[in-house]
Amino acid sequence: MISSRRRLGRGSALGGSAKWLIALFMIVASVLAYCSSSSINDITGEKQYVSLSVEQEIALGLQSAPQMAAEFGGPDANPQDQGEVKQVGQKILASTEAGQTPYKFSFTLLADDQTINAFALPGGPVFITSALYDRLQTEGQLAGVLGHEIGHVVARHSAEHIAKQKLTQGIAGAAVDRKSTRLNSSHH
């Protein structure tokens, strides 16, 4: 006679149903957390899904800035060029709403002369590589690049990306958990 314990084992319909319910709960919880994180961006006026506070964004950017700078050769050694980048960035802040935000903007010219790039971290650190800087011909072009990066910060693009990652991880976690349950039950 088969014991009732064996009939209700991992591979049984009851065990499988419970695992499906757990996976479904994980998915629903992830979607609800994502949807409940909506807010209206004060600068852009757009509805966004962000899971970080502005303070958390600033802390994340300040924490990540040294490592990111190091990956691109650190700050450029030319004080005149470094000063121009900072001055143009500050002019943009002084003449736009971005300067009235709580973000901790900083503007750094990086020494990397091979990678043509500019980027912003959450909370305000803005970087431009010397490879891109050296290709710009006017202060207006530099302002365009820095303004674009400032726009990413005030539009909270990094915070939106992190919220989407959390949603994706929650859904993927449920799928992986469900798949591993299937694999484990097939080995018994």
Regions of interest found by a model, annotated:
Residues 1-182:
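A Zn2+-metalloprotease active-site environment signal
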Residues 183-188:
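Single conserved hydrophobic/aromatic residue that forms the stacking wall/gate
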